[in-house]
Amino acid sequence: MTDRHVLITGGAGYIGSILTSELLRANYRVTVLDSLLFGGESIVPFLNHPNFHFAKADVTEPRAVRDSIKRDWQKPDTVIHLAAIVGFPACQAVGKSVAWKYNVEATKNVHGQSAELGADRFVFASTYSNYGLSEDGKPVTEESPLNPQSLYAETKIASEEFLLSQKDSTCAPLLFRFATLYGISPRTRFDMIVNQFVLEAFTKRSLIIYQRGYSRSFVHIRDVVRGVMMGIEAEKEIVRGQIFNLGTDNGNYTKSDIVNFILKRMPETVVEYKDLTFGGDMRDISVSFEKIKRVLGFDTTLNIDDGVREVLFALKTGLIKDPTDDKYRNAQFIVQ
């Protein structure tokens, strides 16, 4: 499939580094555009791959996409836009103007350049946080009202609104609202709830859990990559202008459920439950993933127990030497 060329913004990141690997494995040409804010070690193994090209750039730059293309390669037919200030804490840390610049204005910039280059598919990484809370207790669908509870969700909704206004353009948007991710990556994050809980249980032998009964939807990072690849390989007219929740109906868990998976492998962990009276991340939501299963035939292959097991293995074996380093946490590292 060397006639297919995919450009990934944020390709050195948590999702992008695995996606790059899988696209190369599937014989795509891959251009990674990344500012390397969190380093570039995750893509070092690809540097000598004949179908890989890297360009260091900031997605807010007006020529970032155009100048990243290798001259003797065909222009990208698909652009996957992952680069962003990701997460509620990180957006709060940088403030509204910076979050808006990198999450909204950059999306418009990257889409515009992608269209000028002739790309016919634009994949956008969004979030199920856009729904806010499940007030009636029913799983939210892609048609449910949006009720953002954070600056991060506000920026993603604004980007979605722009992209959906471009659904009839030659560069057709495809939007994925990811569930909460977990699992190990070449650029692992320990500010994701499952990974974070495993790390705390491993290093402290204890956990403090707030709002134990609050529900969220979870998905393994490798399943997210599979879902994105199914989206770029689907018939264009099937996915043009479409929004898909990306996860599984079997992935809706409370925080107590996550703790139970951890206790299965670390039964010595002491758990203390507390309630938040204000502040913090108060999401309580259940999500439906019926649409992506029906339209794309997607379902997950990994579960929470798989994620707990692999994170624990990485910690026990020392594969990740200093998991407390702030580089594994978006907000803390950005503040530095």
What does each model-identified segment do?
Residues 1-170:
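N-terminal Rossmann-like NAD(P)+-binding domain of SDR-like oxidoreductases, especially those catalyzing
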Residues 60, 130, 181-183, 224, ...:
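Conserved sequence/active-site signature of Rossmann-fold short-chain dehydrogenase/reductase
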Residues 29, 51-53, 172-174, 208, ...:
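Conserved beta-strand segments of alpha/beta enzyme cores
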Residues 136, 149, 161-216, 221-232, ...:
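NAD(P)-dependent short-chain dehydrogenase/reductase
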Residues 205, 209-336:
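C-terminal substrate-binding subdomain of Rossmann-fold SDR/epimerase-dehydratase oxidoreductases
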